[in-house]
Amino acid sequence: FMELIQHYNARLRPNESGVREAALQKNLYVDNCIVGADDYGSVMPHVLSNFVNIVTLNYQIGVLYVQNPPRRVLESLQSALDGDIEYKGSSYVKLTRTVLKTIYQNLDNDVLGQDQCKKQILSGMYRLTTGTHGKPVVLMLYGPSGVGKTESAKSISKSLGGELLRIQFSMMQTEEAFNYVFGAEHSKSSLARDMVGRESNVILIDEFDKVNPAFYNAFYELFDEGRYVDTNYDIDLGQAV
């Protein structure tokens, strides 16, 4: 994809590219074009808004793979190519009673003591086993340092087959942190981008009580309905923990 963008930019500014204009006007044939999740941050905003026009202008692509597209890219694709789009998403481990037993066994091995807390964690997660619950399970682990809060989250994530996504909220005290949570420029790191690329369906928001209360507004819809929306992404977290 980035090679295609370089060719596109050279076509816009042939005098600066050093490439003969006749060569730039030739159609390019590509069997497979892959747009990785990190590629969006390497291009200008107009590339996202005109994504379909750019990738189809004088380019013939057999199969276009687009990973975790921002909203503008997805809407551009849906508007022009909706009937030709095949959607594939990550599949996370489905929570069943058997999986709950595994979670409890791992918690027992990984975290010393806290027997009542472990039972309450399992009780909170049980509703996801019905398969009809469209909201995430929100668990508040509260207590002094060293009692096993973070280790419990890591253990649950391990049981569900992936590395824990850990968001360190004690660092969220600047304007850059505000942009990270609510989304700003597509080229910047964001909470939404991190969540859409997570390995497991377990997200730890560490030291949630240490942040400016203004940040809590970003989580009301997530906790209530399982959706997280910022300026670039709209994410379904309905079965997350």
What kind of feature is each model-predicted range?
Residues T56-T96:
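Interdomain "pre-motor" coupling segment immediately N-terminal to P-loop NTPase/helicase cores
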